Swiss-Prot record:
<feature type="binding site">
    <location>
        <position position="14"/>
    </location>
    <ligand>
        <name>Mg(2+) 2</name>
    </ligand>
</feature>
<comment type="similarity">
    <text>Belongs to the exonuclease superfamily. TREX family.</text>
</comment>
<dbReference type="InterPro" id="IPR013520">
    <property type="entry name" value="Exonuclease_RNaseT/DNA_pol3"/>
</dbReference>
<dbReference type="GO" id="GO:0006259">
    <property type="term" value="P:DNA metabolic process"/>
</dbReference>
<feature type="binding site">
    <location>
        <position position="122"/>
    </location>
    <ligand>
        <name>substrate</name>
    </ligand>
</feature>
<feature type="binding site">
    <location>
        <position position="193"/>
    </location>
    <ligand>
        <name>Mg(2+) 1</name>
    </ligand>
</feature>
<keyword id="KW-0479">Metal-binding</keyword>
<dbReference type="InterPro" id="IPR036397">
    <property type="entry name" value="RNaseH_sf"/>
</dbReference>
<comment type="subunit">
    <text>Homodimer.</text>
</comment>
<feature type="binding site">
    <location>
        <position position="16"/>
    </location>
    <ligand>
        <name>Mg(2+) 1</name>
    </ligand>
</feature>
<dbReference type="GO" id="GO:0006308">
    <property type="term" value="P:DNA catabolic process"/>
</dbReference>
<dbReference type="GO" id="GO:0006281">
    <property type="term" value="P:DNA repair"/>
</dbReference>
<comment type="function">
    <text>Exonuclease with a preference for double-stranded DNA with mismatched 3' termini. May play a role in DNA repair.</text>
</comment>
<feature type="active site" description="Proton donor/acceptor">
    <location>
        <position position="188"/>
    </location>
</feature>
<dbReference type="GO" id="GO:0060090">
    <property type="term" value="F:molecular adaptor activity"/>
</dbReference>
<dbReference type="GO" id="GO:0003677">
    <property type="term" value="F:DNA binding"/>
</dbReference>
<feature type="binding site">
    <location>
        <begin position="16"/>
        <end position="17"/>
    </location>
    <ligand>
        <name>substrate</name>
    </ligand>
</feature>
């Protein structure tokens, strides 16, 4: 059971980066949608009854030019490249990005819960590594929810141990198609993936809010994906 306080704001997060953890990637695109708990507890629908994004939400999307090169696969999937970002004169993940991120989070009612799909294995450790490189921190009471193990856990509970759910895919695209019988738009752009993630969350909002209250992990327990070369922790 989580000992963290009940989150007031949920900040849905997605990162696009230069590659997988094995290449010690850098962030190239960052998108966050901040939604108050009350909007998740009372999802909105259009005239046809379809789920829509909350009318009140804050958005932040930034592109940045990493120092490390993109792997060919990462560039193919994301549509981003070092050349394209440099041509648009985008700086890297620097102090200005940190200040913008901190200002964005400071406008939200706390405590904050960061939400990402596969967040514990990718988004959170990578963001932690980039922040640590710059000596930056997030608010002390920030917690994290990874919707990938959360949805798997919820489905296991509903299936009472049967294997039927386990054979289904849990990528964002698979979940979106299963819940909405449609394909997500703008897949593998940070903002497009956050839009998809938020709709998936809204589809099972009551269950995921309860899961977050019980299972959210404190940001202080997130380990960086890798340490910068000059990090004191690397000194024996």
């Amino acid at each position: 059971m989580s000992e963290a306080p009940r989150a007031e704001t949920f900040v849905f997060l997605d990162l696009e980066a230069t590659g997988l953890p094995s290449v010690e990637p850098e962030i190239a695109e960052l998108s966050l949608f901040a939604v108050h708990r009350s909007s998740l507890e009372n999802p909105e629908h259009d005239e046809s009854g379809a789920l829509v994004l909350p009318r009140v939400l804050d958005k932040l999307t930034l592109c940045m030019c990493p120092e490390r090169p993109f792997t060919a696969k990462a560039s193919e999937i994301t549509g981003l490249s070092s050349e394209g970002l440099a041509r648009c004169r985008k700086a890297g993940f620097d102090g200005a990005v940190v200040r913008t991120l901190q200002a964005f989070l400071s406008r939200q009612a706390g405590p904050i819960c960061l939400v990402a799909h596969n967040g514990f294995d990718y988004d959170f450790p990578l963001l932690c590594a980039e922040l640590r490189r710059l000596g930056a921190r997030l608010p002390r009471d920030t917690v994290c929810l990874d919707t990938l193990p959360a949805l798997r856990g919820l489905d296991r509970a509903h299936s009472h141990g049967t294997r039927a759910r386990g054979r289904q895919g849990y990528s964002l695209g698979s979940l979106f198609h299963r819940y909405f019988r449609a394909e997500p738009s703008a897949a593998h752009s940070a903002e497009g993936d956050v839009h998809t993630l938020l709709l998936i969350f809204l589809h099972r909002a009551a269950e995921l809010l309860a899961w977050a209250d019980e299972q959210a992990r404190g940001w202080a327990h997130i380990e960086p994906m890798y340490l910068p070369p000059d990090d004191p922790s690397l000194e024996a």
